[in-house]
Amino acid sequence: MIKEILEKTGALMEGHFILSSGKHSSRYVQCARLFEFPEYGDIVGEELAKLLRKYDVETVVGPAMGGVILSYVVARYLKARSLFAERENGVMKLRRGFFVRPGEKAAVVEDVVTTGGSVKEVIELLKEYGANVVCVGSIIDRSGGKVDFGVPFESLLKLDLPVYDPEDCPLCKQGIPAEKPGSRGLK
């Protein structure tokens, strides 16, 4: 069902992409396209909330941009608070009056996990506040099982999409221009 939603909304894209991690791929999942349609965002959020419910989450935190809407929808179904972390001078921060209490059970959610870098930054940020990060959830896991957050990781769909280091990218070698659809590094 999730893959069909991604295809129907145009969220599953083909081309030459530079991922937030700096790696390259011929496929990209732009979950912002999925969230253009609230009915599909609700389905995805509810399904992820079902997977995370067993962790008794009090607060759901998503990294900007990919986790902002997702954290809100998942939190609504878990009857939890929703926050997002955003970069300030390249460092993840809780801003806009957001806070977590020491010991508060938090879930970190992200639309797509490839290397897990943004999620790991948010986990470290929450630990600095004394939060108890109990799980991570994502719509798409494209990590190939290579990421370890130190807590349970739940995803709605595992996609084995090609990922290349820039120097090994066959699309670069063919001279195909790359686009960077993610949000990291945008001003």
From Swiss-Prot:
Catalyzed reactions: orotidine 5'-phosphate + diphosphate = orotate + 5-phospho-alpha-D-ribose 1-diphosphate
Cofactor: Mg(2+)
Enzyme Commission number, as recorded: 2.4.2.10
UniProt pathway: Pyrimidine metabolism; UMP biosynthesis via de novo pathway; UMP from orotate: step 1/2
Amino acids binding orotate: 114, 142
Domain of life: Bacteria
BP GO annotations: 'de novo' UMP biosynthetic process; pyrimidine nucleobase biosynthetic process
Top enzyme category: transferase
GO MF annotations, alphabetized: magnesium ion binding; orotate phosphoribosyltransferase activity
This protein's UniProt keywords: Glycosyltransferase, Magnesium, Pyrimidine biosynthesis, Transferase
Cited InterPro entries: OPRT, Orotate_PRibTrfase_bac, PRibTrfase_dom, PRTase-like
Residues reported to bind 5-phospho-alpha-D-ribose 1-diphosphate: 110-118
Similarity-based family: Belongs to the purine/pyrimidine phosphoribosyltransferase family. PyrE subfamily.
Stored HAMAP family: PyrE
Subunit structure: Homodimer.
Function according to Swiss-Prot or TrEMBL: Catalyzes the transfer of a ribosyl phosphate group from 5-phosphoribose 1-diphosphate to orotate, leading to the formation of orotidine monophosphate (OMP).
Name of the featured protein: Orotate phosphoribosyltransferase
Gene source species: Thermotoga petrophila (strain ATCC BAA-488 / DSM 13995 / JCM 10881 / RKU-1)
